[in-house]
Structure formats: C-alpha cells, structure tokens
C-alpha cells in the first residue's frame, strides 16, 4: 500500500469524528431556531424543540434521539376533534397511551422524549367535511450508542494496520537492498569462476519493481550496477561457451568440405600414400613453404616474396623405379654400340637421371 493511502486513512480518521461533532452542533442550532418559531402556539409545552414547519417538502422530519417533536396535520378540518393520528404500526395515538408520550393538541401531534423505536410513518385522518389523510415520516438519529467513537476506533485500527504493513515493507525493501549491495561488493572481490557464480546470485536477487521503487533502486546502486554490467561483459568475452564453439566448429568444417581446402600439414603424407601414376600426368599442389632454388634467375624474383602466395598447377609425369632402371640399362647398351657419340649420350643420360630424380622428389 502506498504512502498516499496511509495519508488518506489518517485524514479520514480525523475528519469523520469532526464531521459528527459539527453535525451535532448544527442540529442543536436548528432545533433552537425551530423552537423559537413554534413559540407562537401557547398550548405547546416549552419542552418541544421541533415544530411542524421543520419537515421538508417530501414530508420527512428528522429528530435526534431524546428530544421532543411536534407534527402538524396540514388537512383542513371543521372541528379539531375530528383529527385522529395513527403510527406506522396502526395504533391510534392519544394522550392516554404510554404515560402521555403522545399528546394531540388541535391538529398537532406532540411526541415527548423521542426514542429510536418511534421512527416511522405517522398519518392523520380527517372525517369532516370530507374524509382525507396526511402522512409524515419521522426519522430518528441514533446517538445512545456513541457512533462517533465507534467510527474513530475503526479508523484508528485501519490506520494502525496500514502503518504496520508499510513499515514492514520498507524494512524488507531496505534489507533486500543491503543484501544486494553486499552481493555486488563480493562480486568485485572475487575472481575466476566464482565471479560468474556471484553474477548469477546478483541476477536472482535483483527484483522486477516498478514506479518509485525502481527509481529508488537505481539511485542506490547506479554506479555499482554500471560497473557490474561492464565486468559481466568482460567476463562473457573471456569465458568459453562450449555449445557455441562446437556449433562454430561444425560450421567451419562444413565450409571446408564445400570449398575442399587441403591442410598443408597432411599434404606430405597424402603424397607419400598416393600410388604412382601411369604415364598420364596428375595435378599436384606445390607446398608454399618450399625453399627457393639457387638458380641465378632466383635473385630476380626477390620482389615477389612480399606478394600474396598463389597456388600453381604443374603437370608432371612420374615413372616407377623399375622403368627408370630399364631406361638406364638401355642407354648404357646403346653407348657400347655408338662410341663416337659416347660423350653426348653420357651427358643426356646424366640429364635424364637428374630429371628422373627431381621428378621422384616431387
């Protein structure tokens, strides 16, 4: 319950009893004025405080318990003896009933010492010159039970309950804020995995509060909340997330399979395990980490070292070792039959061996 509800209850508990007191004062003043107006009729006793002129247009008379009331019959009668009064219970009222409580004088009904049971409808009947009736409602204010004290007690009890509930809520909120601030301070003092655990505890402890409580919480923990958010961001970047990493790795593997990118580390092993091809050439990928040759033309390509590496497809022919030996034997046999060309054949044989050796190395 909010603070303005407490203030409203407090104001109501003060205004209601004051209204009862003011009503009693106004009623007593009205009674005294009406008694002065009714003083023209000398036949009325001086104890009557209300006259027939006090009723309103809807023929209702309001009287306080313990006072006396005079009700006038507004019908025209040739003789006052022809006027008869009856209450709401149907009893005929005269001076003989209840020890002179009701007194009929001319066309007036005087009720002394009005009680709460006297409330109801009072009707006067006229028999001459014509038969007619006139009714007046009497309402009695109940004051013997002291209702003002009753209302004051009820309002005080309601205000006390409201005050206790608000104080309890404020104490709980203050305790919660202290615990939250303590948890944030412990978060700043911890390191590693415990920091993440403290972050979860703080997240559980921060409630979802609206209106003024949110503003109060923001004012109390504004700076530390910003620090906490910054530390959480740094912690989220440093702590690995296994499911996310596995998903990224699976995505990268699918991408590698789609573009068929070979791993340079496994390239040498794949070349060794690959069987020798026949005379038809195959396409091989040259390892970019291979050293440059010591040829004289290599110095002219020093400027290409800083350029981005590119893949070059080279078509080569690979021969088996048995084929190489047979070719070598045939070349040696031919050298015996042609001695004049011994020097040229030897040079061609050496060049062929060097080429075969380089091809086997590749």
UniProtKB/Swiss-Prot annotation:
PROSITE patterns this protein is in?
IG_LIKE
Q: Which residues cross the membrane?
A: 147-167
Question: Region (Disordered) spans which residues?
Answer: 282-306, 319-362
Q: Taxonomically, which superkingdom?
A: Eukaryota
Q: State whether keyword Membrane applies.
A: yes
The disulfide bonds in this chain are 73-124
- Membrane topology listed for this record: Single-pass type I membrane protein
Q: Name one GO cellular component term.
A: plasma membrane
- Is Cell inner membrane a UniProt keyword of this protein? no
Task: Please give the chief subcellular localization of this protein.
Answer: membrane
In what way is this protein post-translationally modified? Glycosylated.
Which segments sit on the Extracellular face?
Answer: 20-146
Instruction: Note the InterPro entries from the entry.
Output: Ig-like_dom, Ig-like_dom_sf, Ig-like_fold, Ig_sub, Ig_sub2, Immunoglobulin_dom
PANTHER family attached to this UniProt entry: MICROFIBRIL-ASSOCIATED GLYCOPROTEIN 3
Q: What's the protein name?
A: Microfibril-associated glycoprotein 3
Look up and give the organism this protein is from. Answer: Pongo abelii (Sumatran orangutan)
């Amino acid at each position: 319950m909010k603070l303005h509800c407490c203030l409203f209850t407090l104001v109501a508990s003060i205004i209601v009893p004051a209204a009862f007191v003011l009503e009693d004062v106004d009623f007593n003043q009205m009674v005294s004025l009406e008694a002065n107006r009714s003083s023209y009729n000398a036949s009325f006793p001086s104890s009557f405080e209300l006259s027939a002129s006090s009723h309103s247009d809807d023929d209702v008379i309001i009287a306080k318990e313990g006072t006396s009331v005079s009700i006038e019959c507004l019908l025209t009668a040739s003789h006052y003896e022809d006027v008869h009064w009856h209450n709401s219970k149907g009893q005929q009222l005269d001076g003989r009933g209840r020890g002179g409580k009701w007194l009929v004088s001319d066309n007036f009904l005087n009720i002394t010492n009005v009680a709460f049971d006297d409330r109801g409808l009072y009707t006067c009947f006229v028999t001459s010159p014509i038969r007619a009736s006139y009714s007046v409602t009497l309402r009695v204010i109940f004051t013997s039970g002291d209702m003002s004290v009753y209302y004051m007690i009820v309002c005080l009890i309601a205000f006390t309950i409201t005050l206790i509930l608000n104080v309890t809520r404020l104490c709980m909120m203050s305790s919660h804020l202290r615990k939250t601030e303590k948890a944030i301070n412990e978060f700043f003092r911890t390191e590693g995995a415990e920091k993440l655990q403290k972050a979860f505890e703080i997240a559980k402890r921060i409630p979802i509060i609206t209106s003024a409580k949110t503003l109060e919480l923001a004012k109390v923990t504004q700076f530390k909340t910003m620090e906490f958010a910054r530390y959480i961001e740094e912690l989220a970047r440093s702590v690995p997330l296994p499911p996310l990493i596995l998903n990224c790795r699976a995505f990268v593997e699918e991408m590698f399979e789609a573009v068929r990118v070979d791993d340079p580390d496994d390239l040498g092993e794949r070349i060794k395990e690959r069987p020798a091809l026949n005379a038809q050439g195959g396409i091989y990928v040259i390892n970019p980490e291979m050293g440059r040759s010591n040829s004289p033309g290599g110095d002219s390509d020093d400027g290409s070292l800083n350029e981005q590496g590119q893949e070059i497809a080279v078509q080569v022919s690979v021969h088996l070792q048995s084929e190489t030996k047979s070719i070598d034997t045939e070349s040696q046999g031919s050298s015996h039959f042609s001695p004049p060309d011994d020097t040229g054949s030897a040079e061609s044989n050496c060049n062929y061996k060097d080429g075969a050796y380089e091809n086997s190395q590749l």
